[in-house]
Each structure stands twice: as C-alpha cells, then as structure tokens.
Amino acid sequence: MTAPSTPSASSVVPSGADTSPHVAAIHEKILIVDFGSQVTQLIARRVREEGVYSEIVPFQKAEAAFAEMKPKAVILSGGPASVLDADAPAAPMAILEAGVPVLGICYGEQTLAKQLGGTVEAGHHREFGRATIEITDDCALFDGVWQKGGTYDVWMSHGDRVTKLPDGFRGVAKAPGSPISVIADDKRKFYATQFHLEVVHTPDGAKILRNFVRKVAGLTGDWTMRAFREEAIEKIRAQVGTGKVICGLSGGVDSAVAAVLIHEAIGDQLTCVFVDHGMLRKDEAKTVVDLFRHHYNIPLVHVDASETFLGALSGVTDPEQKRKIIGKLFIDVFDAEAKVVGGADYLAQGTLYPDVIESVSFTGGPSVTIKSHHNVGGLPERMNMKLVEPLRELFKDEVRALGRELGLPEIFVGRHPFPGPGLAIRCPGEITAEKLDILRNADAVYIDQIRKAGLYDAIWQAFAVLLPVKTVGVMGDGRTYEYVVGLRAVTSTDGMTADYYPFDMAFLGATATRIINEVKGVNRVVYDVTSKPPGTIEWE
C-alpha cells in the first residue's frame, strides 16, 4: 500500500528543502547526467545492481553536482532533443575535462561526439525499436560479451547519428541507420553507444554496462544494504537527537521498512499511526498491528476510521473524486491522531529516490496527470514538522532488500504493490461495505490460489476487481443475479509498462470455481488480458 509511504516529492518537499540525497563520501559513485530520457532511472538502477551508488541530476545542475559529489565516472543519458538545435542541451566541459571515465548513451553519444569536435547529422533513416549491430573492432565495453565480426540485437531510438569521429576516437560497431553505433577513446576512457543498453530489449546491455562500471571505471562495488543500514541509523540519530518522530504506517513495504529502520535508530522516540480506512485487504489491519505492536514493540496508534471514510464516499462513483476524498480525509484523521500523540518534532515518510528525481523535471513544465497519487502531501506544511526520509536514496527493489536485511517477514517485503486508496479503486462505481466484503474475500481466494501454485513471485501485481454489474446465473435449481469479479495479474519490471500474466486455463477455471463457491454474492468470474499501454494496471 503506497499511502502514506510513497508521496510525490514535488508535493511534499517544503519550500527551500534539500532535494538531493546524500551518501557517505566513502562510497564509490557514478553521476548520471539526465538529458530527459524516459528511461534514465533504468541506468541508475542497473548501476546500483552492480553495487555502485549512482545519482541522477538534470544537465543544468550537472557541473555543480559533479564538483560536490566527486564521482568516479559519469554517464550521459539519452534525451528527446537534437544536438543540431541551437539551444541543444550539452554536458559541462568541466566534466569532460576532469579525467574521469565517461559513457554516453544515445543522445549522450551524440553530444559527446559533437562537443569534442565530431560531426552529427540528421539521419536519413530513423531507427526506433529493435535493431542489429555489427561489431567492427574490439572494445573494453565488449570484453567477454561481444566479439569482433559478430552481430547482436539492440534497442535503438534516434533520428540523428554520428558521421565523423572526434580526434582520439574510433568506431567499433555499425548498424544500418547509424554507421558509427559505438565509439571509443581508450586513452581518455570515453565510450558511447547509439543504442540503449539500459533497457531489457538490449539483451546484453547489463553486461556491457557492467564492463564500463567494473573494467573501464575500475569500481569494486561497495553499495550494499548492510552498509546503508548502518549509515542510515547514524544519520537518523544525528538528525533527530532527542526529538520525537511520528510515522504514518500503511502496511505497505515502504512505510514498514522506514518504521523498522527508524525504530532501530531511536527506539520509543518513534510512534506509528496506522489509519484503517476500511478498504484494506482481508486481515491486513490485524497483520499490521500484530507485526509492529506485538513483534517489533513499536508504539502504535491504530485508528479504525472505516465508517468515516465509507460515509464520505457514499454515492461517489468518479474514481478521481474517490482518490481526492480519501487523500484529504486521511490527512484529517492522521493530523487529529498526531495531535493526540502530541510532542512530535518530525514526520517520517517513505519517500523513495524516484520521488526525488521526479521533483526536478527535464523541462520544468507540467506533465499530463493520468491518475492522481494518494499521498500525505499536505501533512508537512499543515503540521509544521520537519521531515525524516531515510529511504530517499533508494529504489523500490533496494527497499525490499533493506527490509530483508532488517529481518522483516517476506510476506511484507515481497508483497505486491497496493494502492493508497486500497480496494476503493478496485470497486468501480459506488462503494459500500457489502461490496468491499465481497471484493476482499474474492481477492483473498485469488491470491491464495496464486501462492499455492507457486506463482506469486513471478507476478508483479495481482488482484481482484468487483464490477458494478450483476449477471444471471444458475446455482442448484435456482436462478441467481449476482456480481461479476474480474481478475487481473501482470508482469512488469518497473510498473511503467506491463503485460498480462498468461495463466493456463486450468488455473483460471479452478480459481473461478473457488471464488463462486466460497464468496457469497458472486456468480461470474472474468480475466483481464489488457496490457499497459493501452490500459493501466489498476482499473481506476
């Protein structure tokens, strides 16, 4: 469950607050200069998978970040601009003259080549999607991965192309739409690829990036969750001192890990507030209370506000309206309980690194809102409290790894994402207590089936939806007129795109039979085979 653990940083960071994470100076670091690519975050994640801390900064702030961060290497991301434009984004020359290894990707290759004296031209043939490159010479990036003379699949997304190399560079690969697909300056340790090595569609991309990190930059990889845990505890103690911290606990991964980490640092100076809005999964409230109050002995205030929330949602059918009502009411209830606790100086939030990245956009302009995100964005200003955000340096997969390091049960650490508004957005149309009970029970049966089949960890997210329609059925000798349950399961790496999970029909048939037999009020079950895009993962 994301609320209140994964707020959008643009809405929660107070005016003037520091928006960059800080990592101990002892760690090896790679700076990623962002030119606006939609997949820049993947570069950072791939680097961290190699045990090296990476940080993304927009190109406008790259020179200052480089001076402060003192990275061991730099990666230039892709981007939507053309280096041929008069106002094209560029890498700071101070970075290119600093003597550290540099890797350019797509736009990063083009700007590196152009800035160092090469030529870039508009391509006669654009390359978008899967492409094949031929390796024309050996290169440190290819060591142990690709051989001279071989051809390999990659993912391209470009219009411009490098046509003349800067002094000191050599071309080491070619493709039909980009005759100089990979460039190398071995003396300066400058390398660049026209293709996107960070995406899964380039099968050997991770290995090539590993070669840059390990063999070119010579980094050993000291970024571990064990080290992070120790450093985070010291930072929390230094920040909080003898102050009191209040943490909104949702039952989701982020808030759970943040709470346990903070409690390990400051003990009973932390109080958690768990607001049950009545739209949680089956037995979820009991599980949260048992784990945090009885197992970890964390001071916990459990508020059953289900009647308040359901009353406010009565008659509401618009999904955006539901989200806004739940978000505002959550703030009201949390604020009231925080005042009862009293004396808190700090508000703990499970802000993650992607939230921090999103707060500094490439263009500085607005983006289209597909769905509003439920968070506690109004709390810091409203409660006049300082923020404690111990996870702000981490990606989601790192949070899970930290949770395991802290000893959190796998049922918490490995659970599928759950939306802040909970079952409210899995119950299209008006929400009632009866509908929520039906949905809660159907969802529990579905997840139980998935776990028994050993499929839970192979699926990014799975859940049931209660449709706002009834259909005719036959049970025994009688006619029924009951609800339809939709089942959804998707595979994904980051939630940005997703494919439906291809269950076999025997599994779906057995699951449908169990739901209809065990859940009163349901007489039909359907399976959603929509990918994202065009659909979204959630129904509302």
Swiss-Prot record:
Reactions accelerated catalytically: XMP + L-glutamine + ATP + H2O = GMP + L-glutamate + AMP + diphosphate + 2 H(+)
> Can you give the residue ranges of the GMPS ATP-PPase domain?
223-415
Query: What is this protein's function?
Result: Catalyzes the synthesis of GMP from XMP.
Q: In this protein, which residues make up the domain named Glutamine amidotransferase type-1?
A: 29-222
Question: According to its record, what are the GO cellular component terms?
Answer: cytosol
InterPro entries given for it? Answer: Class_I_gatase-like, GATASE, GMP_synth_C, GMP_synth_GATase, GMP_synthase, GMPS_ATP_PPase_dom, NAD/GMP_synthase, Rossmann-like_a/b/a_fold
Q: What class of enzyme is it?
A: ligase
Q: Which domain of life is it from?
A: Bacteria
Q: Which keywords describe this protein according to UniProt?
A: ATP-binding, Glutamine amidotransferase, GMP biosynthesis, Ligase, Nucleotide-binding, Purine biosynthesis
Gene3D superfamilies attached to this UniProt entry: 3.30.300.10, 3.40.50.880, HUPs
The record, for PROSITE patterns, names:
GATASE_TYPE_1, GMPS_ATP_PPASE
Descriptive protein name = GMP synthase [glutamine-hydrolyzing]
Does the record's keyword annotation contain Ligase? yes
Binding positions (ATP): 250-256
The record's note on quaternary structure and interaction partners says:
Homodimer.
Q: Which GO terms describe its molecular function?
A: ATP binding; GMP synthase activity
Q: In which pathway does it act?
A: Purine metabolism; GMP biosynthesis; GMP from XMP (L-Gln route): step 1/1
Instruction: Write down the EC number.
Output: 6.3.5.2
Query: Is ATP-binding included in the keywords of this UniProt record?
Result: yes
